[in-house]
């Protein structure tokens, strides 16, 4: 996808124009369901807007996931330097992952639903 090309969000694809902590809820939701991909450097309409400092942003993404979601989800990061984008792929899992706010999230496109589970 080149700059200017557009895509659409789906149940397993989310766009983030820049790195904010809201992506952690999406990671948790994807991991608690069938998995999914977050593309950083795309606006809400799927337009490639690029992201600055790709390597530094990747380190921040890894640090946030590793410290803010327990147990740690199975994920991979890849960069697309030509288009200045980052692809975060989260695999679905049967474990119930949660952010440190201790709320479970399930993704049901187009929204994420908090769910309370009796233990």
Give residue spans per PLM region.
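Conserved N-terminal catalytic/coupling substructures associated with nucleotide/phosphate chemistry
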Residues: 1-119
């Amino acid at each position: 996808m080149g700059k200017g090309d557009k895509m659409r969000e789906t149940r397993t694809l989310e766009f983030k124009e820049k790195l904010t902590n809201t992506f952690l809820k999406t990671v948790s939701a994807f991991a608690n369901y069938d998995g999914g991909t977050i593309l950083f450097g795309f606006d809400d309409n799927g337009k490639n807007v690029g992201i600055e400092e790709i390597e530094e942003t990747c380190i921040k993404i890894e640090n946030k996931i590793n410290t803010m979601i327990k147990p740690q989800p199975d994920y991979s990061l890849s960069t697309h330097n030509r288009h200045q984008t980052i692809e975060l792929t989260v695999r679905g899992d049967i474990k119930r992952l949660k952010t440190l706010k201790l709320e479970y999230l399930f993704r049901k496109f187009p929204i994420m639903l908090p769910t309370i589970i009796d233990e």
